[in-house]
Amino acid sequence: TWTLSRDADIGLTFVGVNFYDGQGFMVRKNSGVTSTSQFKDGISACTNLGTTTELNMRDFFNSKGISYTPVTFEKADEVVAAYDAGRCDTYTTDKSGLAAQRIKLSSPDDHVVLPETISKEPLGPVVRQGDSVWEDIVRWSLNTMIEAEEYGITSANADSMKTSENPAIKRLVGAEGEMGAAFGLDNEWNLRIIKQVGNY
């Protein structure tokens, strides 16, 4: 997640956002809880130790005046196992993470991700500060995938786009221009990205 402290304090540069996520909560269906507005004092919540997720959880419960017990672990698999074993009433992390971790539960269909989102989590590629060439390459790799989607270029049709009538598409797939030269790359670097990972 792109945060001010991570951007300013730990020597990293965030080059863009490729996914906006947000923190949510998962509960057991048989709890009858369908909204965070139903959370009561004494609730226990599993999450990862020392993360923005833990801080967001604290802020959420404090802002609602709900007393809670944090149940924290360093590793995501430990959090999932604890929640699955019933050591906490709810599990909180980014909603994409909840969806992915839910399938690891012993009975995935017995759990539901609640509709509320309590934070904005801009996710994207990160590089170390001080390497401006690598930063540019990573940024323009992200831009390549976004532009490929705008033009309808996929991993399946990327090669055929070399003969497009659109000059911008031809430049993007390396059939015209010298887009890679500024970074010391060959002209098909964008094409290889699209062929390997597709578009945005």
Locate the predicted segments by residue:
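Acidic, polar ligand-binding/catalytic clefts
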Residues: 1-39, 95-121
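A residue-level marker of the well-folded mature domains of exported/periplasmic proteins
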Residues: 70, 85, 108-109, 131-135
